[in-house]
């Protein structure tokens, strides 16, 4: 399983900003979405809104998120709702990696504002943006034809687009299942083992 999460924040400063929307979708290993997912809006601390710059304020106004914040949940309520959904499909903590786009930023805010949720997922991340950056350098044609994002800056739509993007990268970049024959895998492993470190080479 993979736990896909996207967050909207009042900004990117961990000391002065915070989460205002969190959405989650769980997929199996083949990227099939489990259930309906969850999307929660959080009523922010007043000082977070005061710190919001014009760019972020305009972005959240255009998306409609800013107008919904007054009716948002508390951070604790929001965390519990997201965890309840995840636990339905991932009943054991520390098993499913966190997935998304540029997920390190989201994870940092989750660790600050929703530590129970952040610690529930595996410490490893599946970051679609890493594959995109490699495609940009190694497969420019595939990069140039990747799915166009709508960029509406709402958490659930952003997750759905991230899953769609990984589906695309899997089909255009990844070796079809079940992959190369065992002997071919061994040949390639021998070719690169110690290529830089010298370890394991005669």
From Swiss-Prot:
Q: Output this protein's name.
A: Oligoribonuclease
What EC identifiers does the entry list?
3.1.15.-
Function recorded in the entry: 3'-to-5' exoribonuclease specific for small oligoribonucleotides.
Recorded hits in SMART domains, A to Z, give: EXOIII (SM00479)
> Does the keyword Hydrolase feature in the UniProt annotation?
yes
Active site per database record: 123
Print the keywords alphabetically: Cytoplasm, Exonuclease, Hydrolase, Nuclease
InterPro entries on file: Exonuclease_RNaseT/DNA_pol3, Oligoribonuclease, RNaseH-like_sf, RNaseH_sf
Query: What NCBIfam families does its record include?
Result: PRK05359.1
**Top-rank lineage group of the source organism:** Bacteria
Any one cellular-component term (Gene Ontology): cytoplasm
GO MF annotations, alphabetized: 3'-5'-RNA exonuclease activity; nucleic acid binding
Task: List the subcellular locations.
Answer: Cytoplasm
Q: Exonuclease domain: which residues?
A: 2-166
Task: Give the protein family.
Answer: Belongs to the oligoribonuclease family.
């Amino acid at each position: 399983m993979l736990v896909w999460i996207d967050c909207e924040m009042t900004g990117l400063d961990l000391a002065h900003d915070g989460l205002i929307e969190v959405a989650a979708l769980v997929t199996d290993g083949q990227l099939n979405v489990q259930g309906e997912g969850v999307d929660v809006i959080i009523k922010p601390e007043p000082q977070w809104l005061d710190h919001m710059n014009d760019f972020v304020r305009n972005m959240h106004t255009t998306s409609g998120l800013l107008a919904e914040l007054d009716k948002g949940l508390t951070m604790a309520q929001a965390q519990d709702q997201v965890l309840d959904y995840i636990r339905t499909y991932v009943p054991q903590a520390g098993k499913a990696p966190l997935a998304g786009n540029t997920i390190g930023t989201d994870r940092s805010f989750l660790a600050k504002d929703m530590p129970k949720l952040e610690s529930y997922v595996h410490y490893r991340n599946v970051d679609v943006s890493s594959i995109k950056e490699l495609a940009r350098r190694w497969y420019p044609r595939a990069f140039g034809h990747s799915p166009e994002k709508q960029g509406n800056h709402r958490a659930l739509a952003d997750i759905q687009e991230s899953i769609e993007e990984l589906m695309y990268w899997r089909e255009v970049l990844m070796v079809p299942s079940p992959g190369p024959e065992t002997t071919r895998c061994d040949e390639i492993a021998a070719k690169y083992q110690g290529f830089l470190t010298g370890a394991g080479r005669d």
